[in-house]
Curated annotation (Swiss-Prot):
SUPFAM superfamilies per record: Thiamin phosphate synthase
Pathway noted in the entry: Cofactor biosynthesis; thiamine diphosphate biosynthesis; thiamine phosphate from 4-amino-2-methyl-5-diphosphomethylpyrimidine and 4-methyl-5-(2-phosphoethyl)-thiazole: step 1/1
Function: Condenses 4-methyl-5-(beta-hydroxyethyl)thiazole monophosphate (THZ-P) and 2-methyl-4-amino-5-hydroxymethyl pyrimidine pyrophosphate (HMP-PP) to form thiamine monophosphate (TMP).
Sites where the protein binds 4-amino-2-methyl-5-(diphosphooxymethyl)pyrimidine: 47-51, 79, 118, 147
EC number: 2.5.1.3
A molecular function GO annotation: thiamine-phosphate diphosphorylase activity
Positions of Mg(2+) binding: 80, 99
Gene Ontology cellular component list: cytoplasm
Catalysed reaction equations from the record: 2-[(2R,5Z)-2-carboxy-4-methylthiazol-5(2H)-ylidene]ethyl phosphate + 4-amino-2-methyl-5-(diphosphooxymethyl)pyrimidine + 2 H(+) = thiamine phosphate + CO2 + diphosphate; 2-(2-carboxy-4-methylthiazol-5-yl)ethyl phosphate + 4-amino-2-methyl-5-(diphosphooxymethyl)pyrimidine + 2 H(+) = thiamine phosphate + CO2 + diphosphate; 4-methyl-5-(2-phosphooxyethyl)-thiazole + 4-amino-2-methyl-5-(diphosphooxymethyl)pyrimidine + H(+) = thiamine phosphate + diphosphate
Organism annotation: Caldicellulosiruptor saccharolyticus (strain ATCC 43494 / DSM 8903 / Tp8T 6331)
Cofactor: Mg(2+)
Protein name as catalogued: Thiamine-phosphate synthase
Annotated keywords: Magnesium, Metal-binding, Thiamine biosynthesis, Transferase
EC class: transferase
Length: 221
């Protein structure tokens, strides 16, 4: 049974891990292998982000990942590519600050698709909300090296601000590791993304289990 948009967005509002592909850091494993391990370990949101492949390769990978996410009842969010999102029937698209504005993308995709926007500042958060984004990516919380030109860390203070004032769900991202995850949760984040910590792990399933344990222990406390 397919989820309504509101049910999908509930995943962003709850304590959750937001999975992200990053083949460059995956120790020789393919995006498909990594996504399968994430889904088998209970991750319900997958963002396909791949900057250095041809459009044809991205399309073919996305089709495979879409099938996997359907099997596991998970969401697929496509980074940057509005057309690719539509072609593979993904659940939504994630836009960077250099991409098209969310309000213009909404005109193309309509109300049923989820639109996320990367943000680094309070002004960008407020603009994303104003433009009708469904959620934001907030970061990098700590120093991060997954992007070619990383933004300076925004720190836990910004996470605290978003937890209090942001009117839509946010995903804390950037430099989050097993050892500092609890600090991010304490600052008010619920949905978190640990990119290289997961994809670069020797044992992805075991790593995700440890992360879930930290999240569940925090929820109980």
């Amino acid at each position: 049974m397919s989820l309504s948009k509101e049910e999908k967005l509930q995943l962003f509002k709850s304590y959750n891990i937001y999975g992200l592909t990053a083949e460059k850091f995956s120790n020789g494993r393919s995006n498909i292998e990594v996504v399968k391990a994430m889904l088998e370990s209970g991750i319900k949101i997958i963002q396909y982000r791949e900057k250095h492949k041809s459009l044809k390769e991205k399309y073919e990978e996305c089709l495979q990942i879409r099938e996997l996410t359907k099997q596991y009842g998970a969401l697929l969010i496509v980074n940057d590519h509005v057309d690719l999102c539509q072609m593979v029937g993904a659940d939504g698209v994630h836009l960077g600050q250099e991409d098209y504005p969310a309000k213009e993308v909404r005109k193309i995709l309509g109300e049923d698709f989820i639109i996320g926007v990367t943000t680094h500042t309070k002004e960008q958060v407020e603009k994303a909300v104003e433009d009708g984004a469904d959620y934001i990516g907030l970061g990098p919380v700590f120093q991060s090296f997954t992007k070619d030109k990383p933004h300076p860390p925004i720190g836990l203070e910004m996470v605290r601000w978003a937890a209090t004032y942001c009117k839509i769900p946010f995903v804390a991202i950037g430099g989050i590791k097993e050892h500092n995850l609890k600090d991010v949760l304490k600052a008010g984040a619920k949905c978190v993304s640990l990119v290289t910590e997961i994809v670069g792990s020797d044992d992805i399933s075991q790593k995700i289990k440890k992360l879930w344990d930290i999240i569940k222990e925090f929820e109980r406390s």
